[in-house]
């Protein structure tokens, strides 16, 4: 599903009057989650899931086909843990 299709889905599910209103709601939600995560806070929506950050350790590796090696730095990455209700809905959709 692409963004335009998702906007249509949100418009119908949220009973918005226009696609613009639905898109503004989606944009507000994503901005709020981005803001919280960038501050190191987590966002928990009971039943849906939890958005949080995790530390990802740097890695060492070798470039295939050459003798060159590389190392990546440690970094903070976003993480999502689905909630119980979301897991059940996905399972029912099989």
From Swiss-Prot:
It holds the Pfam family Bac_DNA_binding. GO terms for biological process: chromosome condensation. GO terms for molecular function: DNA binding; structural constituent of chromatin. The keyword DNA-binding applies. It comes from the Bacteria. Keywords: DNA condensation, DNA-binding. Signal peptide: none annotated. GO terms for cellular component: cytosol. Homodimer. Histone-like DNA-binding protein which is capable of wrapping DNA to stabilize it, and thus to prevent its denaturation under extreme environmental conditions. Belongs to the bacterial histone-like protein family. This is DNA-binding protein HU. It comes from Helicobacter pylori (strain J99 / ATCC 700824). The lineage of its organism: Bacteria, Pseudomonadati, Campylobacterota, Epsilonproteobacteria, Campylobacterales.
